[in-house]
Amino acid sequence: MPFIYCITNGNKKIHPSNQLILAALKEQFRDEFQIYNSPDTSAAIQRIHSLQQTCTHLIGVGGDGTFNVLVNGVCSHPNPAFRPILGVLPNGTGNDFYRSAGFQSTHDFFEKIQSGTFDLFDVGKVQTEVETRYFANITDIGFGGAVVLELPSAWTTSKDAHELVE
């Protein structure tokens, strides 16, 4: 039986369609499903580092930044054998990784978890003298975040923007 651990951005409201998916996962997997509302990136990575081999699936509810936190938490995990199946429910601004993974709807995501199927993806590594970071679909040096900050909030929170990934 899989053990599914879900990390959400505790500072962001979860879209209603994702709330339904989380409720369905909780109902199906019961004690094998837990949700952690992370207050920030470092808390999320610390929580991922505390997970053990019993965690078979790690799901983020967010966008590319949330998925990046999952990738960095798993790749920097103290136990290099810790490699749960990663997933993301789109609750971000761009949701590029979710779209590039070929999901047409959050229902597709739910069915993939139920069926136990998954796809492999490449992870890149950037190592400096100060730190090591990992990335799955894109890396930048801060410009991407600046663009998101400049977007009108109506565009990033509108129903139409979320339906782009549903």
Region roles according to the model:
Residues 63-64, 92:
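Gly/Ser-rich catalytic serine loop of serine hydrolases
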Residues 5-7, 13, 36-38, 80-166:
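Catalytic core of DAGKc-family lipid kinases
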Residues 62-63, 140:
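Helix N-cap/beta->alpha junction signal
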Residues 66-67, 96:
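Short, active-site-adjacent cap segments at secondary-structure transitions
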